[in-house]
Amino acid sequence: MAPEVRAAFENVRKVESYRLEGWMNPRDVDVFWLRFERYFDDLHYALHTLYGDRADALEQFGRLFGRMVAAYAERPDPLKVLDLERQLTARWFQRTNMVGYTCYTDHFAGDLSGVRGRIAYLQELGITYLHLMPLMQPRPGPDDGGYAMADCRAVRSDLGTIEDLRKLAVDLRERGISLCLDLVLNHVAREHEWAQRALAGEERYLAYFHTFADRTLLDAHERTLPEVFPDEAPGNFTWVPQMAGAGRWVWTTFHDYQWDLNYSNPEVVHEIVELMFFLANLGAGVLRLDAAPFLWKRMGTNC
């Protein structure tokens, strides 16, 4: 850790230690700081690079740190033990005995209970990593294979419930299988609460998305952007006539019903971090970062 980064870490520890009081026992406090120190360099670099020039950068970091503390305090003890095991096992995910299996829940076993009933079969195959393709609540109608989520915290009703997912994660972990879930980062469905509130003209939620009153800027972007689905969804922007009362263009990299999130807005980062902690504390041992190359929009680039 470089001296200036070490100084930043020590300052965080000095200023923020009070947040841990009453949340955790002394052992967990010590483990939290050890793990935070281990990953602080990466965290500091990313946040400083993307948001360090903001006047409220320290305030935003304080909010993020507070949520880290809360999420760790809420984390089940077996998952805390697993965290330590993985931290002590270099490149555990690249071991030669790691064998992955990817499937849609309904195609493989009907629903989440069905997957629990097939864990022994997965063990026989030597599977140690199970990636269940998107199983959270999608929008009605076309949903890009489940990647157009209307509710990122609710399981599709035909597959089960959040409690079913939690139980499955426990059963898999006890059999030595890591559960992988998709963290859909780039977009939400237009039926998602954030999109609906943006549609209604709420300024807070309009800022969650990339929207344009006219084509001046978006035409400049369009000159260097590829088309992901040129036949079925040409272009990268969609006109939404009812948005905010006067209509606006929305950045839609994939389909017109998938609205790209605006990561230059720290509020979006806080929301996604909350979702990440939610899935991790449910028992997801791996989060697949969907469409990550498209997150940060820059004029003149291909994303």
Language-model features, listed with the residues they occupy:
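Acidic/aromatic-lined carbohydrate-recognition and catalytic surfaces
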Residues: 1-265, 269-270, 281, 292-303
